[in-house]
Swiss-Prot record:
The gene is rnz. Zinc phosphodiesterase, which displays some tRNA 3'-processing endonuclease activity. Probably involved in tRNA maturation, by removing a 3'-trailer from precursor tRNA. HAMAP family: RNase_Z_BN. Binds 2 Zn(2+) ions. It holds the Pfam family Lactamase_B_2. It catalyses: Endonucleolytic cleavage of RNA, removing extra 3' nucleotides from tRNA precursor, generating 3' termini of tRNAs. A 3'-hydroxy group is left at the tRNA terminus and a 5'-phosphoryl group is left at the trailer molecule. InterPro entries: Metallo-B-lactamas (IPR001279), RibonucZ/Hydroxyglut_hydro (IPR036866), RNase_Z/BN (IPR013471). Its cofactor is Zn(2+). The active site is at 67 (proton acceptor). This is Ribonuclease Z. GO terms for molecular function: 3'-tRNA processing endoribonuclease activity; zinc ion binding.
Amino acid sequence: MEIQFLGTGAGQPSKSRNTQAIALKMLDERNEIWLFDCGEASQHQILNTAIKPRKITKIFITHLHGDHIFGLPGFLSSRSFQSSDEQTDLDLYGPVGIKEFVLTGLRISGSRLGYRINFHEIDSAGKIFEDDSFEVYTDLLDHTIFCLGYRVVEKNRVGELDANALKEAGLPFGPLFGKIKKGEVVAYDGKTFDPKDYIGADKVGKIVTILGDTRKTKTAVRLAWQADLLVHEATYEASESKMARAHGHSTTKQAADVAKEAGVNRLLLTHISARYVGPLVGQLVREAQAVHANTFVSKDLYEEKIG
């Protein structure tokens, strides 16, 4: 898995930071990309990346403030134009009201999509998605309006099959290898091949937590518990805690406190106020790293491998 930031600014676009959008690239795991928030000009930012819109199969909206949703109608329309003839449906998760916002924009603009949007409006905490390889949980944060955080959990995967050991034990390469990989005991040529003798330890899945706008809250700690990566907003520097609370946001130190309390490995900060440019960004980094060393202040188009 990889994460890429399409927008890292707060409130409105600036010369150096676009509004909020984050791509969680799961190409090796499921040949998909999941998008978290879709602020103004997100589709333009995508043009500066290797992301293909048709690969985006799920969008998770944290809340309905404009800097997190104003890019949705344009992106959804362009996805029709840029995709192949066989267009894939898209799942859209978010607070109650996201369906009305999207459908109203598409209707008034006369836009017609070549694919179906499956809307999943959320009004409470819990598990919102599960398949054979991933689970997604959500919970309510502490912002000025209803706002969500998301916890993406990759399930453990079966360990590597020791093909050389099987061959040396007398099992010819073929379909029986697949049965052993699935956990089946195989009998061949008078011998029994037990999967536990030829499959390594399970590969532990990654945990990624992406939060919307929020004051410091215990909910954030729960969502981020033992995560490999936490994406947390840090709109203000540490000395502006009163300002942050008044506007429903967090400081660098508060975000780092959450990461430390939750036992997070890596913390990436986003939703940075436009007042912080140049050397001031370094100040934000130092404030957070004083609490949680493995921290970085994200910038637009920044990308890194998870774990």
